[in-house]
Amino acid sequence: MKLILSTLIVFIHTLLVSALPTKEGSDPNSAKKYLVSDLPGLHENITPDNSIPLMFAGQLEIYPETDTHYFFWKFSDSNPETVTNRTIFWLNGGPGCSSMDGALLETGPFRINSQQQVISNNGSWHKMGDIIYVDQPAGTGFSYSDTYITDLDQVAEYFLKFMEKYYELFPEEIGYEIYFAGESYAGQYIPYIADAILQRNKKLVDGEHKYDLRGVLIGNGWVSPNEQSLSYLPFFKDHGLIDVHHPKWATLLAKHEQCQKIVNKIDSTFDDGVVHYYEVSSSTCEAILTDLLEYTQDTASEKDQRCVNMYDYTLRDSYPSCGMNWPYELVNVGPFLRQEKVMHQLNLINLKKWNECNGRVGRTFQARHSIPAVHLLPELAKEIPVMLFNGANDIICNSQGVLSYLQKLQWNGETGFTNKDNQISWIYDNKEVGYIIWERNISFINIYNSSHMVPYDLPDVSRALIDLITGKYDEKDVDGKKSFVTYPLGSRKESDASADGEENAGSDKVPGDSPSQTIDPMISSSTASSSSVESSLSSSTASADSDSTSSKFTRLIQLAVILVIFWGVYVLYASYKSRPSSIIKKPTNNTSNVTRSSAGKKKNVQWADQLNQFEDDERTQEPNQGIIAKAIGKITGSKDTRGRYAPVQRGNGNEYIDDIELGEGLSDPNVDEFIIGSDDDEEQGQAHSGAATHNQKQKPMN
């Protein structure tokens, strides 16, 4: 009888499931397929419900022939005060580091607590426009492919293909104003992508739409590698981290002079348009930071306080981690994203184990045939605003290095800033938070009390960068100094806004003096009749309405089927109870024992994705790397691989799990490649991998 009842229950369930209408978004081209409706802690910690952003996420196929999928996570304000048809693409660096750092540690609406639940980030950029975090190049984060790319022109090519596929999902957004933002090695990615978009816009064919690129924002960017490294010794000296009486000063000064010779050589051939090995190879200059971190150890301090944090000189860390155990909340992000339920909630089709950085991606991506992105800035500045913002406490991509390469750069008819001492105070929420130099469509913004990751330290201040680049600020005289004044979200005074409107005759200000050919970054409040929330789902609304009648009819059929089945069950049960009791015999002891023994046996069943995870966990890692082994992602290599692709290995060595953006290994001067440390907590047995991997040394790329 139990078997009959079980069979009937399964039959009922099968009928119900088969009678249900197709799940919304089952069409691979439907945006609803990528809708994210739940996450751990979402409805408990993010209140009220109308403050929960509209989210889409998933692994979007861009090149089926190589099984290349880019993971994206999009956030839109579900309750916007004003409709702004604006899209912000955010990229982290590495190369090979996931943009989920940006989403969950910096500019996204969530942070992750120690219970691996989402909590609010009140400085989220999604209040300023739709923001999309993309794991790229392929192999980074949740993105995957059969091949890895090697050069910056490929980064641009792949990202434009991603944009093409993205706008197929969200066609109503193709006319939105576009901004790119990111940090660190994204200082190489973003200029290349922006340049490719501008070139594409000049060669549109029938049926193609212009991408309305309005500006780029690069935070603590690795834009001019050798020039940046030349700033390390002056930075340490200026901030009291070393002085001329240090016993290693002469050694450091000699290396600094070697780096200066390389930079001089780069300067002499800067405009010839040729990729020179001495410019794309930066190991000599980067070795200065390695030595500085070693020589300035405070061996008398506690073990975890001996080394300067290279991402924030005001902090300390163990040696040789020197900042790899930071940011501290990173230990929550990995376990959160590795939860299988979270992977399903993010609509993953490949349940790939997330790691902050993938060393194989970084080592394959050598950029040997790509001129550093600093060469692209002048052309970009002819058409769009270029904003370079820096946390003042950062060492590895410090402000001195940025100003140094800008002062040599020629753009829009002049060299450098004509008066870099003419600094504009930046006032946010009645406090001076930094200073601005803005001329001819390139701006430099130095932000006080912040690190390599400005939005991590000052999320609300960083969000106001969007106000600066879009002209949503007030110019005032504060304490006798020219100041740009921005405000917390929604608190800009009506009188100030009105005065600003009169002064600018209805248009937004453009900071600095833009050339005549510059596209002004005018981002006005849209008068569109629907919000981005509504438009994101508009493509599916019609089909949902057309299905409403059939859905009601289907439910009636379901109800009828259920009633018939329950009636049948009742008849069987009544027939069973009416049988003579003498027919029903108790089993013998032997039979009972056999039955119990048989019933007590259970099959050990594992899901396929569990087996995949076990295979991932059993993969061995490469030998440990050199001293910083995690600090600056170098754009180097030895083999001519332009336009070629590196196949992804299967089995052992498929995934190289690594740590923070901008890793480097400089222990061997003959080795010139990207090196970073492991971030896989489970495989390395560390709460955070930086301290576990400082002795790793990378083999040269073949």
From Swiss-Prot:
GO cellular component term, pick one: trans-Golgi network
Gene Ontology MF term list: serine-type carboxypeptidase activity
Residues annotated as the enzyme's active site: 184, 394, 452
Similarity comment: family membership: Belongs to the peptidase S10 family.
Reactions the enzyme catalyzes: Preferential release of a C-terminal arginine or lysine residue
Gene Ontology biological process: apoptotic process; protein processing; symbiont-mediated cytolysis of host cell
Subcellular location: Golgi apparatus, trans-Golgi network membrane
Transmembrane spans: 556-576
Keyword flag Signal: yes
Key words, A-Z: Apoptosis, Carboxypeptidase, Glycoprotein, Golgi apparatus, Hydrolase, Membrane, Protease, Signal, Transmembrane, Transmembrane helix
Compositional bias (Low complexity): 524-548
InterPro entries: AB_hydrolase_fold, Peptidase_S10, Ser_caboxypep_his_AS
Topology in membrane: Single-pass type I membrane protein
Lineage: Eukaryota, Fungi, Dikarya, Ascomycota, Saccharomycotina
Listed name of the protein: Pheromone-processing carboxypeptidase KEX1
Glycosylated sites: 85, 122, 441, 449
Signal peptide: 1-19
Cysteine pairs bridged by disulfides in the record: none
EC number(s) on file: 3.4.16.6
Pfam families xref list: Peptidase_S10
